[in-house]
């Protein structure tokens, strides 16, 4: 039985049940005018019921569903940064010739406004890198070692709801493919290095913004994980995982 036929049968049964109840009421009390008055009174309330169900309640349910999806998405993003993202940032940072570290010395005092202002600044930040300072073999090994993991992430249907993260993964896959096709990375011509540089910068820009978004999520929902990420901040050379006891 298809869904349309099933819904039609349900609708007919409900209408029949309503007619049956009204008929029983008429047989017992015999008041047609009361039945008509009662029917019209409730019929007038139907548009309000439709408003409540279709607009307000539906919006509430839709919001709750999106919140659950977002929560699962951020778990996926978190696994990416724990397995690949943070190490990828560290490798690319070795070649950053700008002052991006000055923008991202994040502390416990940062609030949502600080994060949003920093994101706006970094969206216009000139992510210039010196590719000679980046260990291309290390970068290649990282991406090839995690190829299966990245493929599983791409297969996750939740990514349909997260365009920016999907864009980042596609950029990472493209960079991995470019590096994979070059066996000898030590003697590349300048034109080839420039091509790889552009691919790395594309990943770098997307990675920074995604990392900030992830930190904002942790700050609002998981303070203990947020604290760990701050202590492991790849942009802060003074960050330490293990805090010493005060003497």
Curated annotation (Swiss-Prot):
Keywords: Cell membrane, Membrane, Transmembrane, Transmembrane helix. The chain crosses the membrane at residues 9-29, 37-57. It comes from the Archaea. It is found in: Cell membrane. It is a multi-pass membrane protein. One of its GO terms (cellular component) is plasma membrane. This is Uncharacterized protein MJ1433. It comes from Methanocaldococcus jannaschii (strain ATCC 43067 / DSM 2661 / JAL-1 / JCM 10045 / NBRC 100440) (Methanococcus jannaschii). The lineage of its organism: Archaea, Methanobacteriati, Methanobacteriota, Methanomada group, Methanococci.
């Amino acid at each position: 039985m298809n869904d349309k036929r099933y819904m039609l049968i349900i609708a007919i049964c409900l209408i029949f049940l309503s007619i049956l109840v009204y008929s029983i009421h008429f047989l017992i009390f015999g008041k047609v005018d009361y039945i008509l008055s009662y029917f019209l009174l409730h019929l007038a309330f139907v548009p309000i019921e439709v408003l409540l169900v279709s607009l307000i309640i539906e919006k509430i349910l839709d919001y709750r569903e999106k919140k659950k999806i977002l929560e699962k998405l951020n778990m996926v993003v978190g696994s990416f940064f724990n397995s690949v993202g943070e190490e990828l940032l560290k490798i690319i940072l070795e070649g950053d010739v700008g002052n991006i570290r000055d923008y991202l010395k994040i502390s416990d005092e940062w609030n949502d406004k600080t994060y949003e202002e920093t994101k706006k600044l970094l969206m216009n930040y000139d992510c210039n890198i010196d590719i000679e300072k980046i260990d291309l073999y290390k970068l290649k090994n990282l991406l090839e070692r995690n190829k299966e993991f990245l493929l599983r992430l791409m297969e996750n249907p939740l990514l349909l709801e997260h365009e920016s993260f999907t864009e980042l993964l596609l950029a990472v896959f493209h960079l991995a493919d470019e590096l994979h096709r070059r066996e000898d990375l030590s003697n590349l011509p300048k034109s080839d290095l420039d091509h790889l540089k552009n691919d790395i910068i594309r990943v770098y820009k997307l990675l920074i913004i995604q990392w900030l978004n992830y930190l904002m999520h942790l700050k609002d929902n998981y303070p203990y994980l947020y604290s760990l990420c701050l202590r492991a901040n790849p942009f802060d050379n003074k960050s330490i995982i293990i805090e010493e006891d005060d003497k």
